Amino acid sequence: MATLRQVFSISELRQKIFFTFSLLALCRIGVFIPVPGINGDRAVAYFNQLLGSSQNLFQLADIFSGGAFAQMTVIALGVVPYISASIIVQLLVVFMPTLQREMRESPDQGKRKLGRMTRLFTLVLACVQSLLFAKFALRMNLVVPGIVLPAMLSLKLFGVPWVFYLTTVVVMITGTLLLMWVGEQISDKGIGNGISLIITLGILASFPSVLGSIFNKLNLGSQDPSEFGIVSLLILCAVFVFVLMATVLIIEGMRKIPVQHARRIIGRREVVGGGSYLPLKVNYAGVIPVIFASSLLMFPATIGQFLSSESSWLKRIATMLSPGSVAYSIFYVLLIIFFTYFWTATQFRPEQIASEMKKNGAFIPGIRQGKPTQTYLEYTMNRVTLLGAVFLAVVAILPSILGRILRVDANVSYFLGGTAMLIVVGVILDTMKQIDAFLLVRRYDGVLKKDRPKGRP
């Protein structure tokens, strides 16, 4: 409580938190605004019938969008195009030496260029996905007439309802760009990572429906092991606690590398070198691999699902990449491991750490300074990252498997374990760290101001 009072007693931090919550509230408003020409109630009824209790791609997309996907609202695409664009840009940096050189020579200018590239790719991907979404809506309208209002279908060009296509594409692109802008504003002027907070908000919005699914399915008096009874509920709660604890362990765990400091002469005094440690995080990438892997699998599977009626091989791809399938689980695990290594390789700088240690007279016992220290850090980080990546993949995939065994609804297994819980817990921990860091800086700033002699600026 003391920390909470301290948080809200600082005007700047209070403004940042208020700014963040205000923009997140703006995102939630978009969930209830349907695309012009779409009957949201009929769309939700169709999706509920389509999804049922089985694990389905659309179920995952709906959870990530906070219910906007099933209602066919203006932000139905969510931030998936932005995340996919970020993956493409990060891969381009790895495979294009010119971008790498620009990032080294002028980091600020390089970041601005990558930001522009990410926005451009986001626009292109949002355009493609919104076109597919419009096509899928028309296909749904054939099954359940009235999902698309007749007025939107009256104007046609070469048999194509161009007004509906144009309206859907423009509105959904605008919704995606709005979410992208909100995410960037939160990251720059608020607290936490904006895009991650938007995803977390969407996941948390499904919590009431998850509780409803559990209570509707729960049969306390049943002795049939195939039904969801008290034993299944206890197992589900145990899985939830395990995922919660494992997520915290993965994100907070670290390998401490002992570091010694050489004796130094400061003025006329000889300062005796002391000992400290260099923390290497078990999972340096946090929940970024989970978000990237989920979004990357969702993109081709969405295309396959939207166009499955027109091609048998696309239908097979959509079925193969449906959440809960063996192929989906294998690809998901491999992508999590890949993105864990990929993100660590792009963010962890062993050569810079080794250089700073040599400059400050610090060394790892038994390891020479310079290149040997860099090699040792790379080797150690690779081993630690392997452990973290495998652990992260197991935690992400295990609850979905147990969910199928316990015969619970897909939204329950998604929320109480695996992907959703990893993202929610990881983002909350990251946001809390940012708040703690802000409080620490203000505390030191306050001490410096207090100890500053009068008359000095």
UniProtKB/Swiss-Prot annotation:
Transmembrane segment boundaries: 17-37, 75-95, 118-138, 162-182, 195-215, 230-250, 287-307, 326-346, 386-406, 412-432
A single MF term (Gene Ontology): protein transmembrane transporter activity
Keyword Isomerase in annotation: no
A cellular-component GO term for this protein: cell envelope Sec protein transport complex
Domain of life of the organism encoding this protein: Bacteria
Membrane topology value: Multi-pass membrane protein
Keywords, ordered alphabetically: Cell inner membrane, Cell membrane, Membrane, Protein transport, Translocation, Transmembrane, Transmembrane helix, Transport
Location(s) in or outside the cell: Cell inner membrane
HAMAP family for this protein: SecY (MF_01465)
Family affiliation: Belongs to the SecY/SEC61-alpha family.
Function: The central subunit of the protein translocation channel SecYEG. Consists of two halves formed by TMs 1-5 and 6-10. These two domains form a lateral gate at the front which open onto the bilayer between TMs 2 and 7, and are clamped together by SecE at the back. The channel is closed by both a pore ring composed of hydrophobic SecY resides and a short helix (helix 2A) on the extracellular side of the membrane which forms a plug. The plug probably moves laterally to allow the channel to open. The ring and the pore may move independently.
Protein name: Protein translocase subunit SecY
Organism: Chlamydia trachomatis serovar D (strain ATCC VR-885 / DSM 19411 / UW-3/Cx)
